[in-house]
């Protein structure tokens, strides 16, 4: 591997689920050059690329599909805040989650629905009230521990949160 390949691989290893623009900022490479090297790394199976609507995320090859789902959620501020609130205190009601993450009910609803759809959070009925519970607790705990500096302490702006909603 040449120096650029090593640099890109290091960036992706340290920041699983990173998007193209973030890699471009971190590496200092221009769009076309970066695209060429990432395509080459993907073709040789050195990195894993998951393409979704309006976004492409890059992962080390050992990351599983379940892990990539958790990492995708942890890389966005609001879903990360929701998961951390549920880790701190399990079985919260919707209104409690709204207070915890300090976002509007519609924003919390949007991201909570996505977390439920991704099977990271489940809804339980307790005393006829909906309560939210982390479904993949062990996996989330493991990934937070493994990638804490890069995923959890990396600031994301509200604007990026809106743009990268899904």
Model-found features: residue ranges?
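Long, low-complexity, charge-rich intrinsically disordered regions
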Residues: 1-2, 6-14, 80-88, 105, ...
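Short capping segments at the starts of secondary-structure elements
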Residues: 15-19, 77, 89-93
